[in-house]
Swiss-Prot record:
PANTHER family: GLUCOKINASE (PTHR47690:SF1). Pfam families: Glucokinase. The gene is glk. One of its GO terms (cellular component) is cytosol. Belongs to the bacterial glucokinase family. GO terms for biological process: glycolytic process. It is found in: Cytoplasm. It comes from the Bacteria. This is Glucokinase. It is an enzyme of class 2 (transferase). It catalyses: D-glucose + ATP = D-glucose 6-phosphate + ADP + H(+). Its main location: cytoplasm.
Length: 321
């Protein structure tokens, strides 16, 4: 008889829940709920389990916020809860609450070739560290290492490191944004809101008044070639994505590969392919040769967060991935 666990991927707007076959890791019965419609994450879980008439004893839910102890307070939502109390209330034997990019990193060993698009470099080296990052509402970062038949995710808040410009144009962007917001992290330029910041700074650098555009507007105008400022912003976004990925590669020696997740890049995939992304990735001066062979992959799996939550839980329960 198949034994299932509950897995989830929760962001600031939606909660996506599914079942994971503990033996195989297969994800099924995925459903998305609006976080605005429920008073708590526990309430959403109860609704999901009732709707699917399933009894589970184990669960793992990825959440887009730092997980530093028993108390979890979501960054972009009002939900806050005790992991131990939620586990008790649901009657679970195991309940793991992990960072969203911990989940994405744990999905990597489960991905197949059709879930990846490669951007330069050679073949990944088995046993070497892996980096994963992705731009969405924010900028998520994690690393992954393989030790004694176990995958260990190394989460953090790497998206909040300083934005490090490496060209006159990027230095100009930093100067303008610093005058507006003070500290300029990488996330301030590598995210949906970050794309807007790039556009605004580019326009303001010419002493003009920027329009009130959304990330979607900037992308659409850039792809239609109807706005030179939007096209410059999107081009610069791709280059800085490359620079940041190259920094991750240098920091951990990620010869196992660098992986890009998140919902932004797939929206302009052909533009990204032709951009200066890989040039930015390898623009490391004396260490260009060091990163030259490191492969970069775009993850195109529909639900890496759910897949990785399942992998994390299965490994916790003693399965070898």
């Amino acid at each position: 008889m198949t034994k299932y666990a509950l897995v989830g991927d929760v962001g600031g707007t939606n909660a996506r829940l599914a079942l994971c076959d503990i033996a195989s890791g297969e994800i099924s019965q995925a459903k998305t709920y609006s976080g605005l419609d429920y008073p708590s994450l526990e309430a959403v879980v109860r609704v999901y389990l009732d709707e699917h008439s399933v009894s589970v004893e184990d669960g793992c839910i990825a959440i887009a916020c730092p997980i530093t102890g028993d108390w979890v307070a979501m960054t972009n939502h009002t939900w806050a809860f005790s992991i131990a109390e939620m586990k008790k209330n649901l009657g679970f034997s195991h309940l793991e609450i992990i960072n969203d990019f911990t989940a994405v990193s744990m999905a990597i060993p489960m991905l197949k070739k059709e879930h990846l698009i490669q951007f330069g470099g050679g073949e990944p080296v088995d046993g070497k560290p892996i980096a994963v990052y992705g731009a969405g509402t924010g900028l998520g970062v994690a690393h992954l290492v393989h030790v004694d038949k176990r995958w260990i995710s190394l989460p953090g808040e790497g998206g909040h490191v300083d934005f490090a410009p490496n060209s006159e144009e990027e230095a100009m962007i930093l100067e303008i944004l610093r005058a507006e917001i003070g500290h300029v992290s990488a996330e301030r330029v590598l995210s949906g809101p970050g794309l807007v910041n790039l556009y605004r700074a580019i326009v303001k650098s010419d002493n003009r008044l920027p329009e009130n555009l959304r990330p979607k507007d900037i992308t659409e105008r850039a792809l239609a070639d109807s706005c030179i400022d939007c096209r410059r912003a999107l081009s610069l976004f791709c280059v800085i994505m490359g620079r940041f990925g190259g920094d991750l590669a240098l920091t951990m020696g990620t010869f196992g590969g660098v992986y890009i997740a998140g919902g932004i890049v797939p929206r302009f995939l052909e533009f990204f392919k032709a951009s200066g992304f890989r040039g930015g990735f390898e623009d490391k001066g004396r260490f260009k040769d060091y990163v030259h062979g490191i492969p970069v992959y775009l993850i195109v799996h529909d639900n890496p967060g759910l897949l990785g939550s399942g992998a994390h839980l299965r490994q916790t329960l003693g399965h070898i991935l």
